[in-house]
C-alpha cells in the first residue's frame, strides 16, 4: 500500500523548523491569513519564558486559526520533551469536538526535528495524524554571509589533527539536522542578497545534506498555502533515512545538551524614541554577540504595541496590534545567546538604552 493511501482519513500535520530568526513565525502568520479555507491547529514550541511567537500569531486575526486553536509549549525544547509535552498536547488537540483540518507545528530555533517526527509513530497519534511534510526555513542572508561555513571549515580542518574535535559546533549541527529532516526547504529573505549570493546559498545548503529536498525562494516568508500544505509525504515512515547528529551521539553513548544556549527576559518601561532605541540596540547586540532578540515595546501615545525582532544586527520592527483593554503596557524582550553570554552585562546595556 502506498504512503498516500495508508494515510487517507488522517489529519495532515506540517512541521516547520529552521534556525533562530529564519522567519518561521512570519511565514506561518502569512499562511494563517491565506489558508484557503482550512481550519488550522497550531502548536508552537518557543525557547524562553516569554511566548512572543505565540502572542504574535494570536494577534494576527486570522479566521483559519483562532486563539483557541493555538497551543504554546514554552521554556522547553520539544525535541527533549516529546513524551512529557508534545504527545499529551497532540492528544488533547485530537480530542476536541471541532478538530482542525490541518495541524502546523512550529519548532523553536533550537529543536531537533527528528525526535518530533518519530513521535508521530506513537500508536494513539499514528492512527489519527500523519506528517504531511517537514518545511525547513533558511535565513538566506545569514548563510550568504558565511555564518555556518566558516565554523565548518575550521573544525573540519582541525579534526584530522585533534581527536577531541570530532564533533562540529552545536549551531552547525542544528542547521544540518534541520536540512536533513526537510521535505521542502524555503530559502527566505532572498531579497536581501544578489544573484551570486543566492547561488552560493543554494550550493551551501545542498552540500549540507545528502538528501535533496525541493528548494524554493521566498521573501518576507510569503509562500502560498498550496505549496506548504498537501505535500503528502508521510515523513514519519521515512525517519530512519533522516538520522540526526543527536541520534548518532546517543548511539555513541553521548548526551545532547541545550546548555550551549541561554535565554532571559528583559522588562523595561516605555520607549519614548523607538528609532533611537533600535539604533543603539544594534550596538548592544553586536558587542555582546546576541544571536536573537524578540519582543514588544510600549511607545507613549501609540495605541498599538511595537513588535521588535532581531537576528544579529538586522532588526525588524512594526506595530502589530492594539493593546488590549486592561492589558499591562510595557516593554518585554527575550534575549537568546550562547551559554557564555554575560547576562548581567547584556541586561544592563539594554536597560541603559531607555
From Swiss-Prot:
Major enzyme class: hydrolase
Q: What EC number(s) does its UniProt record assign?
A: 3.6.5.-
**Biological processes annotated in GO:** cobalamin biosynthetic process
Pfam families reported for this sequence: cobW, CobW_C
Q: Which residues are GTP-binding?
A: 18-25, 80-84, 188-191
This entry's Gene Ontology molecular function terms read:
ATP binding; hydrolase activity
Q: Which InterPro entries match?
A: CobW, CobW-likC_sf, CobW-like_C, CobW/HypB/UreG_nucleotide-bd, P-loop_NTPase, Zinc-reg_GTPase_activator
Domain CobW C-terminal intervals: 261-354
Q: Which SMART domains match?
A: CobW_C (SM00833)
- Whether Chaperone counts among this entry's keywords is yes
CDD domains given in the database record: CobW-like
Q: Which reaction does it catalyse?
A: GTP + H2O = GDP + phosphate + H(+)
Q: Provide the leader sequence positions.
A: none
Q: Motif CXCC motif at which residues? A: 77-80
PANTHER family per record: COBW DOMAIN-CONTAINING PROTEIN, COBW-RELATED
So what family is this one in? Answer: Belongs to the SIMIBI class G3E GTPase family. ZNG1 subfamily.
- Summary of the function given for this chain in its UniProt record: Zinc chaperone that directly transfers zinc cofactor to target proteins, thereby activating them. Zinc is transferred from the CXCC motif in the GTPase domain to the zinc binding site in target proteins in a process requiring GTP hydrolysis.
Q: What is this protein called?
A: Zinc chaperone CobW
Q: Which gene encodes it?
A: cobW
Amino acid at each position: 500500500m502506498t504512503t498516500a493511501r495508508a494515510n487517507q482519513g488522517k489529519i495532515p500535520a506540517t512541521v516547520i523548523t529552521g534556525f533562530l530568526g529564519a522567519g518561521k513565525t512570519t511565514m506561518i502568520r502569512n499562511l494563517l491569513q491565506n489558508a484557503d479555507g482550512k481550519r488550522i491547529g497550531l502548536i508552537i514550541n518557543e525557547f524562553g519564558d516569554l511566548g512572543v511567537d505565540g502572542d504574535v500569531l494570536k494577534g494576527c486575526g486570522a479566521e483559519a486559526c483562532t486563539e483557541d486553536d493555538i497551543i504554546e509549549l514554552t521554556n522547553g525544547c520539544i525535541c527533549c520533551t516529546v513524551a512529557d509535552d508534545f504527545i499529551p498536547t497532540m492528544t488533547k488537540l485530537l480530542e476536541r469536538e471541532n478538530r482542525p483540518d490541518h495541524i502546523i507545528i512550529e519548532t523553536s530555533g533550537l529543536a531537533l526535528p527528528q525526535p518530533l517526527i518519530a513521535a508521530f509513530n506513537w500508536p494513539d497519534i499514528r492512527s489519527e495524524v500523519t506528517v504531511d511534510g517537514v518545511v525547513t526555513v533558511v535565513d538566506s542572508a545569514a548563510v550568504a554571509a558565511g555564518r555556518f561555513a566558516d565554523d565548518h571549515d575550521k573544525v573540519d580542518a582541525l579534526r584530522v589533527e585533534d581527536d577531541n574535535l570530532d564533533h562540529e559546533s552545536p549551531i552547525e549541527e542544528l542547521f544540518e539536522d534541520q536540512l536533513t529532516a526537510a521535505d521542502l526547504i524555503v530559502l527566505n529573505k532572498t531579497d536581501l542578497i544578489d544573484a551570486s549570493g543566492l547561488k552560493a546559498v543554494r550550493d551551501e545548503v545542498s552540500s549540507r545534506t545528502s538528501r535533496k529536498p525541493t528548494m524554493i525562494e521566498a521573501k518576507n516568508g510569503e509562500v502560498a498555502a498550496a505549496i506548504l500544505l498537501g505535500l503528502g509525504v508521510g515523513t514519519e515512515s521515512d525517519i530512519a533515512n533522516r538520522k540526526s547528529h543527536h541520534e548518532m551521539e546517543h548511539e555513541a553513548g553521548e548526551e545532547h545538551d541545550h546548555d550551549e544556549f541561554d535565554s532571559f527576559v528583559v522588562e523595561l518601561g516605555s520607549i519614548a524614541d523607538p528609532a533611537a532605541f533600535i539604533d543603539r540596540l544594534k550596538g548592544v547586540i553586536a558587542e555582546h554577540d546576541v544571536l536573537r532578540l524578540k519582543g514588544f515595546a510600549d511607545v507613549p501615545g501609540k495605541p498599538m504595541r511595537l513588535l521588535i525582532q532581531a537576528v544579529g544586527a538586522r532588526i525588524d520592527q512594526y506595530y502589530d496590534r492594539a493593546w488590549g483593554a486592561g492589558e499591562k503596557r510595557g516593554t518585554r524582550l527575550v534575549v537568546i545567546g550562547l551559554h557564555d553570554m554575560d547576562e548581567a552585562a547584556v541586561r544592563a546595556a539594554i536597560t541603559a538604552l531607555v
